[in-house]
Amino acid sequence: MRDARTHREDEMTQTDTQATGPDRAEEQDGQRYDAFALQEKWLPVWDERKPFRSGEPGDERPKKYVLDMFPYPSGDLHMGHAEAYALGDVIARYWLQRGFDVMHPIGWDAFGLPAENAAIKRGLDPRRWTYDNIAQQRASMRRYACSFDWDRVLHTSDPEYYRWNQWLFLKLYEKGLAYRKDSLVNWDPVDQTVLANEQVLPDGTSERSGAKVVKKKLTQWYFRITEYADRLLDDLDTLEGQWPAKVISMQRNWIGRSTGAEVEFAIEGRDEPVTVYTTRPDTLHGATFMVVAADSDLAEELAAGAPDDVRAAFEAYRTQVQETSDIDRLSSEREKTGVPLGRYAVNPVNGERLPIWAADYVLADYGTGAIMAVPAHDQRDLDFARAFGLPVRVVVDVRDDDGNPLPDPAESGTATAGDGVLVNSGALDGLGKQAGIAKAIEDLTAAGKGRAAKNYRLRDWLISRQRYWGTPIPVVHTENGEVPVPEDQLPVLLPPSEGLNLTPKGTSPLGAAEDWVNVPSPVDGSPARRDPDTMDTFVDSSWYFLRFVSPHDDTKAFDTDLIAQWGPVDQYVGGVTHAILHLLYARFITKVLHDLGYLPFDEPFTRLLNQGMVQMDGSAMSKSKGNIVRLSDQLEEHGVDAIRLTMAFAGPPEDDIDWADVSPSGSAKFLGRAWRLARDVTSEPGVDPTTGDAALRSVTHRTLHEVSQHVEAFRFNVAVARLMELVNATRKAIDSGPGAGDPAVREAVEATAVVLSLFAPYAAEDMWSLLGHDPCVARAGWPAVDESLLVQDTVTCVVQVQGKVRDRLEVSPDITQDALRELALASEKVQAALGGRDLRTVVVRAPKLVNIVPA
């Protein structure tokens, strides 16, 4: 990362250095480029003219929906925001210039724990903290020249928005996709609330508080996302080439579909069999014991019928397991623990009695919470068997590359998990893996003891939270059960926070708001209590992109006619941190709404761009490291345009940026050079460019053509590099070519202003004005490219004397070595550098380089 970006900064520095002389001369005439003055000059004009308003009645332009992931209002904008909004803005402005009616809205993901925790810490109302931060961020976005349609703003904490969260909940409830159940949940002991599986980090800690997550049994609300597991997985194929491969891979792995069989094991002393899911039913003959998750209901039931000493040992062990994170439990490095339950299962293929153990390395929510242990061919089972002296039976003959049998796992301690031929397996002996699996499933099905099955890593989405600052769940509870609040009684408003103790205590603060909680049932008026939990804020963001098409509609969540025109989102921009959470949930909700008839599409985002992180000195910015760079400080030092241009030029957008390696001052110098071009043009607007210098026109049109290609491919840094080349060529044409009055110079500078408006809108707007045009350059339109000028008639040849550049010659791409040698030696600048000295050697690399070494 560092080397590549440093190279790009060197390129910018070299570009500026080459023009140091002319720049200084131009600054001495009293008309200098002042980035801050331009910000003050043009922002009020844009506020008045609203060039980014979208969806005007009668607008027949083709539509393009560009969306940045909306921010959480946790303070002012930081450098990560600066990068994301700069890149998203390039895309939105580009398509606007290309003649599209671009909807580029913004809003705030305004509910959530940070506001509530800040309110507790500071003694503030969460509303005040949230909306004060929104006002601050909004002002910064305006200053940063984000091309948002400010008439479409939404806040998820507004009742006008979260009313439709509740409507969405009711729609899922009606379809059987929202339900309530008792289950073991991830519990954050610091924030005192539950977490979805996706909100637990790989190290077993909460993504929000950093606390070690534990298991707790609670009654919670879920969305049945597993009903859509196959579609969510299979439809990823349609996103190939449009979404980053990394995101697609992460979602595939998270959904985690596997194929295998469900096998029924009879349990001695129990009427109902236990169903076990396995991907290797061919190895059933190698099962020597059964393991059930220690925190599962099944383990508790089996232990209840055991002797007192077994039951007591199990209860103590169960408590220990519930205090251990899933990540720790699944660690291959962790010592295996467990307790026998004194019960036996019967292997359906050979009738053997298998002792049943409760252990922590099996999770209650994987499959049925019970596994058949085949220790010879599964390392975790083998580790457990060796720890407790359980038998190990080889049923797959696995060989090394030389055809030699691998060591016995019971002796080597290493399970043989590769493919091989089945042995010690009755009728399956001699079969390979796939044939063995197929035969095992066939036999189990015929015997009524099993069936083919799929399993998923994905679990239903836990959406209830025990906190205040969120969307109230629109359900009341009566003595006869749960009752959904009718749609005509929405929204269920949050009560004021005054008088409520918001400090985390394991139950929702709303439960203490007696006047709010106690209500009559909407069915029969009998006493009822509102559900005291609030929704996961990822519900808010799972459909917000739909609301933007009609954000002020108080009759429906979104206008179905408008969403059919605008949707799905053509271009989505945001960080890869949301690959599993937000993006998966948004895909799920979109498919549900499609199935309910509200949407004509079932994928929310056609294209996705993940920008990298902004770091400092090789590590993420954080308060604890003391390396945070404030955006406001950078804007005060360098100006908006320089920061935006730096973000685009720093490197490929998906790469991380190390702010220590980039050069906003270099960007500012380049902007001054570009701006002075517009000041120097002397021809009038409307002059016929075809009468101008052909070489410069060729550079201009090649730049427009290539910038289009690079922007559409997200190669923003390369697009900026091409723009720099055009600025250099234009300066050369003014100073030592056809001059400032040449029509080709005006064409080049106008093209520069239009392209620059994608990256540095203030400077571009002023250039457009200096060129004699009315505001706004954002709507100027992309200049038409003359295809005939894309054929490069000349190339620039660099002529060096003793390694120093002395001249640049425009020559034919087909020029011969001899002709180029003579042309270079005839140059007056070269002759002056030689000073009459003889030549030692002349190296010619036609058509781009001549290096002359004098004697």
Curated annotation (Swiss-Prot):
A motif ('KMSKS' region) lies at residues 620-624. ATP binds at residue 623. InterPro entries: aa-tRNA-synth_I_CS, aa-tRNA-synth_Ia, Leu-tRNA-ligase, Leu_tRNA-synth_edit, M/V/L/I-tRNA-synth_anticd-bd, Rossmann-like_a/b/a_fold, tRNAsynth_Ia_anticodon-bd, Val/Leu/Ile-tRNA-synth_edit. The keyword 4Fe-4S does not apply. Residues 1-11 have a biased composition (Basic and acidic residues). Residues 1-31 are annotated as: Disordered. It is found in: Cytoplasm. It catalyses: tRNA(Leu) + L-leucine + ATP = L-leucyl-tRNA(Leu) + AMP + diphosphate. CDD domains: Anticodon_Ia_Leu_BEm, LeuRS_core. Belongs to the class-I aminoacyl-tRNA synthetase family. This is Leucine--tRNA ligase. It comes from Kineococcus radiotolerans (strain ATCC BAA-149 / DSM 14245 / SRS30216).
